[in-house]
C-alpha cells in the first residue's frame, strides 16, 4: 500500500490535476517581466523568450503539466492564483496552501483552492496557441565554449543594478585580462567620460575580453548564479539553488 502522500500525488496525476507550488508561481512572476504571454508545454519544463528575442529562460519544475496550453496575460493569471495561495500556521510552523489546477478541458483550466480557500474555484480560459507560440521556444539552446566563468552572490547583482540606477548607466561590461582576472563594470559604452561602478570577480577567463550587455535585459530571479560568458555574444546564468537558467545576449 502506498504512503498517503504518494497516493495523493498519484491521484493528482491520474486525474490531470497539478498543484502549482509557491516557488513555481514566484518564478513565473519573473518570467512575466520577460514576456507577458507564455505557452506551457506538456511536461515539467517551462520556457519563455523576450519579445526582442535577446533573452531566454527555462525552469525545470516539480510539476508535470498534462497538456500544452497558452496564457496571454501571465500576470493576470498569476494574480488570480494568489487568491488561492495562502499561508497557514500549523503547530507554529507557517505552511503554504497552493492552488490545484485541473486540466479536464482543452479550452480552460479549473482552479481549486485548498485549506482556507477550499470552497473557491475559478475557470480560466487559455489563449490561442497561435498568439502565444512565439512566447515559448521549443528548441534547447546549445551554449558555445565559454571564455569567462565565474559566480556571483545575490548581493553582487543587486549592487550593480543599484549603481546603474544611481548613475543612470545602461550597460554591464564583462572584462578579463590575459592573467584571467575578471571585472564587472556598470558603465555607458558610448560615453568615455561616464561614471563607472566596478567589482572584481573570482573566476576563469581564456584571454583578454571586453563584452557588453544592456542592464535592462537582465531580468532574473533573485539568488546567486554561476555565469558563463562567450565571445560569441551570449551569456548563461545558472541559478545556484533552483533548476533555472537564463540565456542573455551580449551587444555586438
Regions flagged by a language model, labelled:
Residues 122, 127-144:
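Long, charge-dense
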Residues 3-124, 143-252:
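DNA polymerase processivity clamps
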Amino acid at each position: 500500500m502506498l504512503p498517503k502522500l504518494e497516493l495523493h500525488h498519484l491521484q493528482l496525476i491520474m486525474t490531470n490535476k497539478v498543484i502549482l507550488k509557491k516557488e513555481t508561481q514566484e518564478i513565473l512572476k519573473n518570467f512575466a517581466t520577460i514576456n507577458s504571454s507564455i505557452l506551457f508545454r506538456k511536461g515539467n519544463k517551462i520556457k519563455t523568450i523576450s519579445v526582442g528575442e535577446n533573452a531566454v529562460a527555462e525552469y525545470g519544475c516539480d510539476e508535470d503539466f498534462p497538456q500544452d496550453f497558452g496564457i496571454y496575460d501571465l500576470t493576470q493569471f498569476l494574480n488570480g492564483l494568489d487568491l488561492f495561495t495562502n499561508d497557514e500556521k500549523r503547530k507554529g510552523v507557517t505552511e503554504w496552501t497552493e492552488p490545484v489546477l485541473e486540466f479536464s478541458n482543452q479550452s480552460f483550466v479549473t482552479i481549486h483552492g485548498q485549506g482556507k480557500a477550499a470552497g473557491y474555484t475559478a475557470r480560466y480560459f487559455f489563449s490561442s496557441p497561435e498568439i502565444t507560440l512565439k512566447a515559448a521556444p521549443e528548441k534547447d539552446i546549445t551554449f558555445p565554449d565559454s571564455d569567462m566563468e565565474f559566480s556571483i552572490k545575490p548581493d553582487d547583482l543587486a549592487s550593480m543594478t543599484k549603481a546603474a540606477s544611481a548613475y543612470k548607466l545602461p550597460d554591464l561590461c564583462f572584462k578579463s585580462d590575459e592573467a584571467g582576472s575578471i571585472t564587472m563594470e556598470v558603465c555607458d559604452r558610448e560615453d568615455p567620460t561616464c561614471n563607472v561602478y566596478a567589482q572584481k570577480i573570482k573566476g576563469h577567463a581564456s584571454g583578454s575580453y571586453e563584452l557588453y550587455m544592456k542592464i535592462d535585459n537582465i531580468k532574473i530571479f533573485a539568488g546567486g548564479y554561476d555565469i558563463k560568458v562567450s565571445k560569441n555574444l551570449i551569456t548563461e546564468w545558472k541559478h545556484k539553488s533552483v533548476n533555472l537558467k537564463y540565456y542573455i545576449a551580449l551587444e555586438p
